[in-house]
UniProtKB/Swiss-Prot annotation:
Protein name: Cytochrome c biogenesis ATP-binding export protein CcmA 1
Keyword entries, A-Z: ATP-binding, Cell inner membrane, Cell membrane, Cytochrome c-type biogenesis, Membrane, Nucleotide-binding, Translocase, Transport
Chief localisation class: membrane
Gene3D superfamilies: P-loop containing nucleotide triphosphate hydrolases
Cell compartment(s), UniProt: Cell inner membrane
Pfam families found in the cross-reference section: ABC_tran
Function: Part of the ABC transporter complex CcmAB involved in the biogenesis of c-type cytochromes; once thought to export heme, this seems not to be the case, but its exact role is uncertain. Responsible for energy coupling to the transport system.
Native species: Salmonella choleraesuis (strain SC-B67)
GO cellular component terms, A-Z: plasma membrane
Family: Belongs to the ABC transporter superfamily. CcmA exporter (TC 3.A.1.107) family.
SUPFAM superfamilies xrefs: P-loop containing nucleoside triphosphate hydrolases
């Protein structure tokens, strides 16, 4: 379980959120919503331990995140707004970098992400959407329980969004957890996703 307790965050003398508390249990996914500058990416960075809140605490499995960073990061898949891939490597080589023990599974993961036939193309030659798919192919390889995804559908077409949404639904059905930001609808998942709305100084579930 991931828990946020009474989080407070300020940026440039402006309160993004205060008194923000919620939990994400096994089998749940949460969509963080809010306007530009509401603090969506900032919240994800706090939840992953990439930044510290100005007040409050994040807990993982009942322990303060700052005390269990190693075990937490073994359980975490974080894909930020930037793909975080190496453009001089091929799609296959990028996945191998993150998942060196899964060589036999890489082609299937890339195919699931819509990159069949592009496995050995240097990422620098791929479109923005294809580069995003290289990063998202990790969803078919990772064993992490918690997925935190910042705008995963950027530059992804409708069919790709549907495929990725099904993968997230399968992950939560198996007891995984997903937290994501997106402005796009989640096809077929509207009834199962909790929404956390950041409203500037507060939030509502």
């Amino acid at each position: 379980m991931l828990e946020a307790r009474d989080l407070y965050c300020e940026r440039d003398e402006r309160t993004l959120f205060r008194g923000l508390s919620f939990t994400v249990d096994a089998g749940e996914w949460v969509q963080v919503t809010g306007g530009n500058g509401a603090g969506k990416t900032t919240l994800l960075r706090l939840l992953t331990g990439l930044a510290r809140p100005d007040g409050g605490e994040v807990y993982w499995q009942g322990e303060p995140l700052r005390r269990v960073r190693d075990s937490f990061h073994r359980s975490l898949l974080w894909i930020g707004h930037q793909p975080g891939i190496k453009t001089r490597l091929t799609a296959r080589e990028n996945l191998h970098f993150f998942h060196p023990g899964d060589g036999a599974r890489l082609p299937e993961a890339l195919a699931q992400a819509g990159l069949a036939g592009f496995e050995d193309v240097p990422v620098a030659r791929l479109s923005a959407g294809q580069q995003r798919r290289v990063a998202l192919a990790r969803l078919w390889l990772t064993r992490a329980a918690l997925w935190v995804l910042d705008e995963p559908f950027t530059a992804i077409d409708v069919n790709g969004v549907a495929r990725l949404t099904r993968r997230m639904a399968a992950h939560t059905a198996q007891g995984g957890m997903v937290i994501l930001t997106t402005h796009q609808p989640l096809p077929g998942a509207a009834d199962t996703v909790r929404r956390l709305a950041l409203t500037g100084g507060g939030a509502g579930l």
